[in-house]
């Protein structure tokens, strides 16, 4: 197992169509439109042409984190993550203290997804997301719920306890929709989530919780 051999994690089991761009590779069919989706090879090429940093910006990744990828990780820790990730179908929940590398791990997942050809990705720091949802107008509140609910891969960093009723409703609505529609959510926290409804939806659909106790990632300039 190498750090570039991660394709099995995100491969779709159903391959029914032919790529409409290259007309040679097998691909999946869009559930809603019935049309063939671009194959992985074509999506990879398109993302490379757009630019990885541009796609990270579109995904709301903080600029300071653009440099991080799977190569920032200790080899032994990497193997443990691959093993755990191979077991989860939709949701992945990271738990650990401050400065243990949870956010960097999430960014490494995003980096891999982009290089694998995905572009329907969003990253949000939860306190910032909730603040934006409450201070803006009602239409923007609904826009954020719709955006977070329907994106293919959602990454929620720094989930915390003590949500007020409106914050709880906002987060619950997003997570519940994603679970019902089998959309993957990757979350991270440095506390034990004590809200049973929120916690259960972070781990539904064969979700996996990984506890991170040590700082296993390396700085980019130490690769």
Provide a role label for each language-model segment.
Residues 79, 114-150:
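Short glycine-rich substrate-engagement loop in P-loop NTPases that contacts/grips substrate
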Residues 153-154, 161:
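Alpha-helical transmembrane segments of helical membrane proteins, especially in multi-pass transport
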Residues 77-87:
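Pre-Walker A adenine-sensing motif
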Residues 104-118:
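P-loop NTPase Walker A phosphate-binding motif
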Residues 1-79, 210, 217-223:
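A short, basic N-terminal segment
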Residues 89-107:
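Walker A/P-loop nucleotide-binding motif
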Residues 119, 150-153, 180-187:
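Loop/turn-to-beta-strand initiation segments
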């Amino acid at each position: 197992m190498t750090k570039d051999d991660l394709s099995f994690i995100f491969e779709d089991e159903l391959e029914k169509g032919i790529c409409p761009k290259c007309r040679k590779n097998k691909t999946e069919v869009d559930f809603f439109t019935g049309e063939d989706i671009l194959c992985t090879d074509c999506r990879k090429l398109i993302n490379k042409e757009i630019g990885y940093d541009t796609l990270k910006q579109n995904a709301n990744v903080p600029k300071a984190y653009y440099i991080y990828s799977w190569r920032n990780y200790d080899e032994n820790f990497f193997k443990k993550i691959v093993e755990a990730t191979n077991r989860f179908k939709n949701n992945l929940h990271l738990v650990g203290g401050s400065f243990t590398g949870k956010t960097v791990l999430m960014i490494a997942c995003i980096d891999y997804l982009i290089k694998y050809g995905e572009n329907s990705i969003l990253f949000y720091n939860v306190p910032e997301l909730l603040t934006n949802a409450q201070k803006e107008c009602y239409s923007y509140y609904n826009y954020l719920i719709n955006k977070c609910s329907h994106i293919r891969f959602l990454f929620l960093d720094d989930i915390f306890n003590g949500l007020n009723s409106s914050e709880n409703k906002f987060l619950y609505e997003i997570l519940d929709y994603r679970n019902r529609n089998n959309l993957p959510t990757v979350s991270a926290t440095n506390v034990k989530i004590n809200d049973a409804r929120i916690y259960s939806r972070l781990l539904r659909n064969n979700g996996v919780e990984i506890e991170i106790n040590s700082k296993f990632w390396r700085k980019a300039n130490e690769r």
